[in-house]
């Protein structure tokens, strides 16, 4: 009889039965796809042997399009219909797109995510990204010889909910099943850690075309634990290009507004080429013939470029310091620094990293490929292609705290930043007024104490709360962040069981510097925030006590004589007058005075309630 072949759950029993899954690095400048083949992760090339696909899409009339290298080569002749660096637009509104005024595109004034008008119609960043992803999917299926079961797609660690959701939407549009959204620095650590069997504390310095991430990871016996993450969602190699572009224009006495769109794109391409050349040579030339016939020729030295971009280099060190502080480690504790992203090839970056951490960075893996390789390893695991040596665990984190608005515009943090995901946390709240039958749940993101200083993510209402006295209802609010970093919120009234929930999908994501600014502001203004919170709490308590006292006077004012009533009225009036002010101590003092001044009144009301409850009842009935 035939023998039954038994394999561990989740493990493919034979190599020919491996489920095909890939890792995709959807980058600002370039994108690529990788897969595990013969137990080794490798980037998959196109027919010409190129692994990098320029993240460029050119739209033609009658539904035609060019993607990748062909589109990049034609960008200068048709800049309005050739979309580059689309990742910068993902999950963002027009007002949040840095440099939108100088871009050659015709932006459509529409609510939500920014859209671009082309000869083939209006396109969203999700649609453009889907074209790139579909091209990579086709490359993978052609190379691997079968359909894919799914893909792990990498995103910057500092991408917010909207940007992550936009990425998933693009993948679905491209016909990809998303197994996981994986933070780019974490993917790099997986590739590096598994490749080298590394253990200890590592920093991943990820400077891509449009984003910067810095993550601190602890690698221990197959466990990849992200201790802290920092970054800037609007800082990348493109910004270095634009600084050099502006310098070249200034040296030539030109202004960008005076250039034709095709000249802007052509000059940007030449400037980018010069920047890349400076990584290997002490100087580089920028030679351009503009559409006007004017020739522009300049020599850029490495020292000139380094001085020019020094402010941008320093911008990367701010989040680096914060991440180290959050992880409660110092630069000296870091065993190695992994560089990710093509922009880290710049000597000025490598020198700055080496100086800050006191050691040369690790560059034995291609910074353009390392993220995709790590994603491929994770995809292979999630597809069920585990082998005996694949017992490793990934523990990632959320970059910013998630909270809920409470009475007085205060923020109650439910999940603090750098919490390991997936995670679910719950907290109980109650009603503020007697007979309250509904509660508005306002979900916010940020590190500040007041709602007005944080980013609003979503709002929903819990209705059907049974009428009770203030403080009697128990509403349990649960925040749940999945492995992709996406948030769902649930609210349930414990007595009645009524429920409400929302999957957080903001119309578009955080602004250019919102996330970094939120963290920076929280450190700079911590003392001010705490004072503001104390004032708001005092005001809320004062309002509650005034309303409760006035309600009691209406119901049982006859329990006080004229003199006592006058005293209580005076205390109420004093507190009502102070409550809107900004003197928390004075409000607290007046609140305490009213509370103490109504102690006797409260006791009489209690006696009256007890007598009413016992009236007409015999002793043996009690």
From Swiss-Prot:
PROSITE patterns: HSP70_1 (PS00297), HSP70_2 (PS00329), HSP70_3 (PS01036). One of its GO terms (molecular function) is ATP binding. InterPro entries: ATPase_NBD (IPR043129), Heat_shock_70_CS (IPR018181), HSP70_C_sf (IPR029048), HSP70_peptide-bd_sf (IPR029047), Hsp_70_fam (IPR013126), ISC_FeS_clus_asmbl_HscA (IPR010236). GO terms for biological process: iron-sulfur cluster assembly. It holds the Pfam family HSP70. Keywords: ATP-binding, Chaperone, Nucleotide-binding. Belongs to the heat shock protein 70 family. Chaperone involved in the maturation of iron-sulfur cluster-containing proteins. Has a low intrinsic ATPase activity which is markedly stimulated by HscB. HAMAP family: HscA. This is Chaperone protein HscA homolog.
